[in-house]
Regions:
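C-terminal active-site subregion of NodB/CE4 polysaccharide deacetylases
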Residues: 1-18, 22, 84, 92-93, ...
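Metal-dependent polysaccharide deacetylase catalytic core of the NodB/CE4 family, i.e.
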Residues: 21-112, 118, 129-134, 157-169
Length: 192
C-alpha cells in the first residue's frame, strides 16, 4: 500500500490534495501551527486558512509542532510544549482529531519520542522502513533519486510512505514526474 504525507503547509499542498483524491491515496498533511509564518520565512507561499480548512475536511492533518523549530535544539520543556500544545491548537483550528506527529526534519531523541507516543498514535520520521522522500537527491534516500529508492523499498516492504514538501515540488519542477509516478503505480486503482 502506498501512503503519502506532506509537510509544512505550502500553498501547493492544494495540488497534492487533488492528486491524493484523484488516485485515492491515504494522505496526511503535517503542518506546524504557524505554517504561514514558516512559509514567509522560507520564501514560499503558504496555504490560506480557507485552503487549509478545505484540506482538513478531506484528508488527515498531523502536527508538525507550533513553530517548526528543531526539537533537539530546545530545552526539553520547550520541546514538549511544542509537541503537546500543537496538537490541541491544530484540533481547535480545524475541528479535527490530531493523532499523528512529525518532528521538523525528523529531529527527535529517545526521550522526546517516548513523550510523543504518550500523546499521539504515531510519529513519522524522515528515514525508516518504507519511507521515501520525494526529492531529486535526498540524504533520507541515501542520496539516490527517489524513484530508484522507492523500488528498493518496495522490494523490502509492503507499506510505503512517500513524503515531501510541495514547495520543493515547485522548486524542482517535479509535478509532472509525480503525476506520472502515481499514474503508473496507481492508475488502474485511482479515479480517472
Amino acid at each position: 500500500m502506498i501512503r503519502l504525507s506532506v509537510d509544512d503547509g505550502c500553498a501547493s499542498d492544494i495540488r497534492i490534495a487533488a492528486i491524493a483524491e484523484k488516485y485515492e491515496i491515504p494522505t496526511v498533511f503535517y503542518w506546524p501551527v504557524e505554517w504561514q509564518s514558516l512559509a514567509y520565512d522560507m520564501g514560499y507561499n503558504p496555504l490560506t486558512y480557507d485552503e487549509a480548512c478545505y484540506i482538513a475536511n478531506r484528508h488527515e492533518i498531523g502536527s508538525h509542532t507550533i513553530t517548526h523549530r528543531h526539537l533537539t535544539n530546545l530545552h526539553d520543556d520547550v520541546a514538549e510544549r511544542e509537541i503537546m500544545e500543537s496538537k490541541f491548537m491544530l484540533e481547535n483550528l480545524f475541528d479535527v482529531k490530531i493523532t499523528k506527529f512529525c518532528p521538523p526534519r525528523g529531529y527527535t531523541s529517545p526521550a522526546l519520542s517516548t513523550f510523543t507516543h504518550q500523546i499521539y498514535e504515531s510519529q513519522r520520521l524522515t528515514r525508516g522502513r518504507g519511507l521515501v522522500h520525494i526529492h531529486p537527491d535526498s540524504g533520507a534516500n541515501n542520496n539516490m533519486p527517489w524513484r530508484e529508492f522507492y523500488k528498493i523499498q518496495k522490494e523490502q516492504y509492503e507499506d510505503i510512505e512517500l513524503w515531501g514538501h510541495s514547495h520543493e515540488f515547485d522548486r524542482f519542477e517535479m509535478w509532472d514526474e509525480i503525476e506520472e509516478f502515481f499514474q503508473k503505480e496507481l492508475g488502474t486503482h485511482g479515479k480517472t
